[in-house]
């Protein structure tokens, strides 16, 4: 960046054990872990960020790590489940498109807990179950705390936006 000091530069990390995070952190940039990664892969980003910060001689601060997730909140579980998993759901559309593209380009590994799993065994339902946080406010809060427990401390939770099939429900979710 030509401007000194420059605004914060934040890069998206989409791969498990991302080498891009190492390089970004070494340049003084900070990571966003993509919303479509399994938690086990999100967790691999912190050590890579630390590695890059150490290379640059700067402290690794969890406050600089952003984690993106797909989140939908409703007043009751049935409404949340229907909105997220319905055939016309923007969440289903997003993850269906993403899974189709990743499989086509040999990247279905992003959705696998076990890398020996066959690509055909990676289903849309499995990906949605793993990647979407949904439910009542209490359930979603508990799931976010569980995310933090699993992946470690991070600074900012980013909600990955989806199209609004129902404006009132989408606005309420925010």
Residue ranges and their predicted role:
Residues 15, 37, 71-73, 163:
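Active-site-proximal loop/turn and secondary-structure-junction residues that shape catalytic pockets
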Residues 36-39, 158-169:
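Glycine-rich, proline-tolerant flexible connector loops at the mouths of alpha/beta enzymes
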Residues 23-31, 148-151:
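Catalytic domains of carbohydrate-active enzymes, especially glycoside hydrolases
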Residues 17, 42, 140, 170, ...:
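Aromatic/hydrophobic pocket-lining residues that form the small-molecule binding cavity
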Residues 1, 40-151:
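An alpha-helical appendage that flanks or caps ligand/catalytic pockets
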Residues 76-79, 165-174:
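Short glycine/threonine-rich loop-to-helix capping motif typified by GTGT followed
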Residues 1-27, 40-47, 54-55:
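Internal, glycine-rich beta/alpha segment that forms the wall or movable "lid"
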């Amino acid at each position: 960046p030509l401007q000194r000091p420059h605004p914060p530069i934040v890069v998206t990390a989409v791969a498990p054990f991302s080498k891009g995070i190492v390089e970004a952190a070494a340049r003084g940039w900070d990571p966003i872990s993509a919303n479509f990664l399994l938690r086990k892969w999100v967790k691999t980003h912190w050590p890579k960020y630390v590695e890059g910060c150490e290379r640059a001689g700067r402290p690794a601060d969890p406050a600089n790590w952003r984690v993106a997730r797909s989140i939908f909140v409703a007043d009751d579980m049935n409404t949340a489940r229907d909105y997220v998993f319905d055939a016309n759901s923007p969440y289903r559309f997003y993850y269906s498109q993403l899974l189709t593209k990743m499989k086509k380009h040999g990247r279905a590994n992003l959705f696998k807990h076990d890398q020996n799993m066959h690509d055909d065994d990676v289903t849309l339902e499995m990906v949605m179950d793993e990647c979407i946080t949904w439910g009542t406010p209490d359930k979603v809060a508990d799931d976010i705390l569980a995310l933090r427990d699993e992946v470690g401390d991070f600074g900012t939770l980013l909600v990955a936006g989806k199209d609004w099939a129902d404006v009132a429900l989408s606005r309420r979710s925010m």
